[in-house]
């Protein structure tokens, strides 16, 4: 093994959202002088405006720091920043696989949260050296001793040497860097064996093609090397290799233990899947690195342009986003109510939200979104098994044997005062209680099995509002379970509006149908004729409301006179309205499609 790799340390930062991860990364960059004071800005590793505004990390970033340690050596520290949100767990697991150590950041006031725990388990699975850091100790409400105790009780790490720091004021930054040098082991690996490099991220550059962020585990890679992707077998010629400072800097080669990027004129990000192994095309490794899997979308929804002439622009925008985000899937679909659009699949709700916001903001599109749905497995009577992500594609009732829905295993951390409120919420959401653990006298973790379809609507908002914002949630897919599910359709003036259909549990179908038609009655504007709104399951109408017609007072000119004269005028008006109703079409406002999401409000 090359002596040089003894001076390399690869580490990442893991934390719950808002515990100060990006700010700490800023301080480390500033302290080691990777960027000058002039180039520094808040959250320097968060490139998107959206990331800065929401204060979240979506795409993971990487930076190489040169640190002259107290022992006289200069070390190369590769910091791999990870997203903190549950939707991006797979990205976190891949970036942790590229490291030997991790800084565990815990907020001195809030203590351990659900996502902290989930990411710690990922780090332990990858056998990383974990260094606990208690951040925000400058806050008046900081309780470092309590948090130390929590780290020991909940995670089982020795917190006696936990570093007390404040990323905001710069306290403890040198201690953190020294701890990384002292505790994180140097990378193992031989420069002279066949190349094995783990892709932990990729993005698309208009000039260089898809660029892979890699951690070289074995061997070396330089410009001109022929590389092969082990999952697809595709071969490319390397045009450039380099490091991150955080900007890309070209170097001659990157070798075992180092983190860098590879550009090889790859036309499509789909060819550089996160978690895949790159090897030398001529002198190939026998086995890929473990842990690769394709990202599977969990939540689907329809995206339609408000102005149908924007369909082409929407297609271009989705394709451009897909270049940078291979977990986004989309295919064209048509709706009788909304025209042409796309059915899109996302990793989770935040992912869906972020993509929609980027489409509207970066590509200036005005979109209508249909209610999100999950992938159901339908076992038909003839033995065929279908995966349905769009309620409109559900087969007829008499062809269905059973419908299975995706189930998630949720861990909810709350102060013990709110346990009752959370149990009540989970009961409403058809949750199945597994067990609960007391982390301390006043903090509890509840373990539940919940249907994913109940989480995708407003579960997170409800969770926060019922616990005054104190609850934190982490979930993972736990398979499928058969359930009594039905498709609820909406008829407007006798016409089916496919974009308003959704799949719902039978027990809740009547109540939801009732609430939906009431909501739609308030949203759909009055027409010149009466508009019935019906919620139907199969052939059966379960709820109905009517939008009353606007009518002219045809009796205004009759002062007194014969009743039969008045009746004749009213009958004539009624006949006219009837004819209008047969040919009239109802304009559906955009709010109507959002009403499905907000039925429970």
UniProtKB/Swiss-Prot annotation:
Residues 6-188 form the tr-type G domain. It is an enzyme of class 3 (hydrolase). PROSITE patterns: G_TR_1 (PS00301), G_TR_2 (PS51722). It catalyses: GTP + H2O = GDP + phosphate + H(+). One of its GO terms (biological process) is positive regulation of translation. One of its GO terms (cellular component) is plasma membrane. Its main location: membrane. It is a peripheral membrane protein. It is found in: Cell membrane. SMART domains: EFG_C (SM00838). GTP binds at residues 18-23, 135-138. Pfam families: EFG_C (PF00679), GTP_EFTU (PF00009), GTP_EFTU_D2 (PF03144), LepA_C (PF06421). Keywords: Cell membrane, GTP-binding, Hydrolase, Membrane, Nucleotide-binding, Protein biosynthesis. One of its GO terms (molecular function) is GTPase activity. Its EC number is 3.6.5.n1. Belongs to the TRAFAC class translation factor GTPase superfamily. Classic translation factor GTPase family. LepA subfamily. Required for accurate and efficient protein synthesis under certain stress conditions. May act as a fidelity factor of the translation reaction, by catalyzing a one-codon backward translocation of tRNAs on improperly translocated ribosomes. Back-translocation proceeds from a post-translocation (POST) complex to a pre-translocation (PRE) complex, thus giving elongation factor G a second chance to translocate the tRNAs correctly. Binds to ribosomes in a GTP-dependent manner. HAMAP family: LepA. This is Elongation factor 4. It comes from Desulfitobacterium hafniense (strain Y51).
């Amino acid at each position: 093994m090359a002596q040089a790799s003894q001076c390399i340390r690869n580490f990442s930062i893991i934390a719950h959202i808002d515990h100060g991860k990006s700010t700490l990364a800023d301080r480390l960059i500033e302290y080691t002088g990777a960027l000058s004071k002039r180039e520094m800005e808040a959250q320097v590793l968060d490139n998107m405006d959206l990331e800065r505004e929401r204060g979240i990390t979506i795409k993971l970033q990487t930076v190489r720091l040169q640190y002259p340690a107290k022992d006289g050596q200069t070390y190369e520290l590769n910091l791999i920043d990870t997203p903190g949100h549950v939707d991006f767990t797979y990205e976190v697991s891949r970036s942790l696989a590229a490291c030997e150590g991790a800084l565990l950041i815990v907020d001195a006031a809030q203590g351990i949260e659900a996502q902290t725990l989930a990411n710690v388990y990922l780090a332990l699975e990858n056998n990383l050296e974990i260094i606990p850091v208690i951040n925000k100790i400058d806050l008046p409400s900081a309780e470092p001793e309590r948090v130390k105790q929590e780290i020991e009780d909940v995670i089982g790490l020795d917190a006696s040497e936990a570093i007390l720091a404040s990323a905001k004021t710069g306290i403890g930054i040198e201690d953190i860097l020294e701890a990384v040098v002292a505790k994180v082991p140097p990378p193992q690996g031989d420069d002279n064996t066949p190349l094995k490099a783990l892709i932990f991220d990729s993005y698309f550059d208009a000039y260089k093609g898809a660029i892979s962020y890699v951690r070289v585990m074995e061997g070396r890679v330089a410009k001109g090397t022929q590389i092969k992707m082990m999952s697809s077998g595709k071969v490319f010629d390397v045009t450039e290799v380099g490091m991150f400072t955080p900007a890309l800097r070209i170097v001659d080669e990157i070798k075992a233990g180092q983190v860098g990027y590879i550009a090889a004129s790859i036309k499509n990000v789909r060819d550089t899947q996160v978690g895949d192994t790159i090897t030398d095309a001529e002198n190939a490794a026998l086995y890929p690195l473990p842990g690769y899997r394709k990202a599977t979308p969990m939540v689907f929804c329809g995206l339609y342009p408000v102005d149908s002439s924007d369909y082409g622009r929407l297609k271009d925008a989705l394709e451009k986003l897909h270049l940078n985000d291979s977990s986004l899937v989309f295919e064209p679909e048509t709706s009788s109510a909304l025209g042409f659009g796309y059915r899109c699949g996302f990793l989770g709700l935040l992912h869906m939200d972020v993509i929609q916001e980027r489409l509207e903001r970066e590509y200036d599109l005005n979109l209508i979104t249909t209610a999100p749905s999950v992938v159901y497995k339908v076992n038909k009577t003839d033995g065929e098994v279908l995966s349905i992500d769009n309620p409109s594609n559900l087969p007829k009732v008499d062809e269905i044997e059973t419908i299975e829905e995706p189930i998630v295993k949720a861990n909810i951390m709350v102060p013990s005062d709110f346990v009752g409120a959370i149990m009540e919420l989970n009961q409403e959401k058809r949750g199945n209680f597994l067990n609960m653990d007391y982390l301390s006298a006043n903090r509890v973790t509840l373990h539940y099995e919940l249907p994913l379809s109940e989480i995708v609507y407003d579960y997170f908002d409800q969770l926060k509002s019922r616990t005054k914002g104190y609850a934190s949630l982490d979930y993972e897919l736990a398979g499928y379970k058969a359930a009594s599910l039905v498709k609820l359709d909406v008829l407007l003036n006798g016409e089916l509006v496919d974009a308003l259909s959704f799949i719902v549990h039978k027990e809740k179908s009547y109540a939801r149908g009732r609430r939906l038609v009431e909501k739609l009655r308030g949203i759909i504007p009055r027409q010149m004729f009466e508009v019935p709104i019906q919620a139907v399951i199969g052939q059966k109408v379960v709820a109905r409301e009517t939008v009353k017609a606007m009518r002219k007072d045809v009796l205004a000119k009759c002062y007194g006179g014969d009743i039969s004269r008045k009746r004749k005028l009213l009958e004539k008006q009624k006949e006219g309205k009837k004819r209008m109703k047969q040919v009239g079409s109802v304009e559906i406002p955009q709010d109507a499609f959002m009403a499905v999401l907000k039925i429970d409000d």
